[in-house]
């Protein structure tokens, strides 16, 4: 079917990509310009005064004056912003706070300013235009697109609105996409995930769906519901579905499952968005890496991951990075985050242009389903669960079980008990409740029936010692990781027959 929108998309894509090429071809100059603008604009803020921004001329000055901080370390400043104080981290007050699940100390409030907010929308748009420009495929813009996201309902605190990032972004969808966009506003506002998916399936089944977007674990559930309802592969139900857009977690563990659910291959675009900024998107179908966005009000620094915990690690700028090295990514942004450690590690796959893959987290974590569970959270959950019981725990580690033989995926807890234990079902339920209480993403995944509650697998006496010995890491400074985002340790434990 002829579509004017599809016809116009190609010249528009061509125009935007020509504009983008200017900074892509001048990466170092672009980053230097961003750096100077950020320092200049924030020199009159409380943070700028505390760190003598007025005398910062070069990156070396910045390194001397501004230490690396994570959210907890930046929190005293953020709390002042949340309380309604202007000119703290950035000029004026933020437009929004993206509220995200934090560590055990509660929710994180990430500011979004009038300067930073548009970049979240522009980057997503440009990812799609880049795909159109590269492939010549534009017919999909005439069909319906679904973005599986958080509720767009916002709350107010001290005159500033707050919500989930995906919910905030929903308010900024360009006019020309509004008619094509699904689900409806009413459905998007449903808080309960299972009810929401049912409503989305009902709304989308009769439509000409061409683009489906979201975190793979959520999309998988949507696809499975469609298959249950129709008895058909998703690619047969939606014959014109040809583009899957995703971000948030590693897609590789899902790829085979998705190809099976869809029944055929579809093109995909990987995005690298976060509340702290939209960092990169896949700009070439045959390239694994994502184009690092250098003109979006974010100044990047990179620290080799193996030196990150040194007393004074070297903070590299873009010109000094090398392909294939694991770096901790540090950002300074026009939302007022300064030398901020997002917690991600990246690896460059190319320097002409600069492309990255997300290689992991600087701390051990599990986020196979987008849950962002960190070591501190599992330790705290276990501590709360065994309080007042007779359980004595010698050692434990946690891994995701993405493809169980039956039922939903889950977190598998491998625990070695000091004492004799018969039944661990109640302990598992207690740990699960404590973890849900600490981590809102995990809570959503359990309540939305994307995950089933965790399961405990008991380990033989001294089993973990045997495991450490088998990998040549028994004793000394070697620690068993509390959790991993893959099943390397889990598989080895099974292979060594260390299950009780």
PLM-predicted stretches and their roles:
Residues 1-54, 62-66, 77, 83-84, ...:
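Active-site glycine/GP-rich loop and adjacent strand/helix microenvironment
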Residues 131-175:
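Conserved AMP-binding loop of ANL adenylate-forming enzymes
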Residues 109, 145-147, 268, 456:
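Conserved beta-strand scaffold positions in the cores of enzyme catalytic domains, especially
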Residues 117, 121-128, 162, 375, ...:
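Amphipathic alpha-helical segments in well-structured domains
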Residues 111, 115-123, 244-245, 268, ...:
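Long, hydrophobic, well-ordered secondary-structure blocks that form the structural core
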Residues 106-111, 364-368:
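Short small-residue beta-strand/loop micro-motif enriched in glycine and branched aliphatics
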């Amino acid at each position: 079917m002829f579509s004017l929108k599809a016809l116009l998309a190609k010249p528009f894509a061509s125009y935007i990509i020509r504009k983008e090429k200017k900074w892509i071809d001048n990466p170092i100059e672009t980053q230097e310009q961003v750096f100077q603008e950020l320092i200049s604009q924030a020199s009159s803020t409380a943070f700028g005064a505390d760190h003598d921004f007025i005398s910062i001329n070069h990156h070396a000055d910045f390194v001397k004056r501004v230490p690396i901080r994570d959210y907890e370390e930046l929190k005293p400043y953020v709390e002042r912003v949340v309380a309604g104080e202007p000119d703290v981290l950035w000029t004026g007050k933020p437009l929004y706070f993206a509220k995200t699940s934090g560590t055990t100390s509660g929710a994180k409030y990430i500011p979004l300013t009038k300067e930073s907010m548009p970049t979240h929308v522009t980057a997503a748009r440009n990812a799609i235009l880049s795909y159109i420009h590269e492939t010549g495929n534009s017919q999909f813009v005439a069909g319906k697109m679904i973005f599986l996201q958080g509720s767009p309902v916002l709350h107010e605190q001290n005159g500033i609105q707050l919500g989930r990032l995906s919910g905030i972004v929903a308010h900024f969808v360009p006019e020309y996409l509004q008619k094509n966009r699904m689900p409806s506003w009413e459905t998007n506002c449903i808080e309960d995930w299972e009810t929401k998916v049912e409503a989305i399936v009902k709304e989308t089944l009769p439509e000409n769906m061409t683009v489906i977007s979201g975190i793979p674990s959520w999309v998988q559930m949507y696809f499975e519901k469609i298959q249950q309802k129709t008895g058909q592969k998703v690619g047969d139900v939606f014959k014109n579905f040809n583009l899957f857009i995703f971000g948030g977690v590693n897609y590789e563990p899902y790829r085979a499952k998705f190809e099976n659910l869809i029944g055929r291959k579809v093109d995909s675009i990987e995005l690298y968005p976060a509340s702290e900024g939209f960092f990169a998107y896949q700009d070439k179908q045959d390239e694994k890496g994502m184009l690092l966005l250098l003109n979006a009000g974010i100044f990047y620094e990179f620290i080799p991951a193996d030196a990150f915990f040194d007393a004074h690690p070297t903070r590299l700028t873009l010109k000094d990075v090398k392909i294939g090295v694991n770096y901790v990514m540090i950002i300074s942004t026009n939302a007022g985050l300064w030398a901020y450690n997002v917690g991600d590690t990246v690896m460059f796959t190319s320097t002409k242009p600069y492309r990255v893959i997300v290689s992991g987290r600087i701390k051990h974590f599990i986020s196979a389903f987008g849950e962002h569970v960190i070591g501190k959270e599992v330790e705290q959950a276990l501590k709360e669960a065994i309080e007042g019981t007779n359980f004595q725990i010698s050692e434990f580690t946690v891994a995701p079980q993405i493809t169980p033989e039956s039922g939903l995926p889950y977190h598998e807890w491998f625990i070695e008990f000091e004492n004799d234990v018969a039944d661990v079902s109640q302990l598992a339920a207690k740990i699960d409740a404590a973890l849900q209480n600490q981590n809102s993403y995990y809570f959503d995944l359990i309540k939305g029936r994307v995950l089933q509650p965790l399961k405990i697998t008991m380990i033989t006496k001294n089993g973990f010692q045997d495991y450490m010995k088998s990998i040549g890491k028994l004793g000394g400074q070697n620690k068993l990781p509390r959790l991993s985002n893959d099943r390397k340790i889990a598989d080895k434990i099974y292979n060594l027959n260390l299950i009780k």
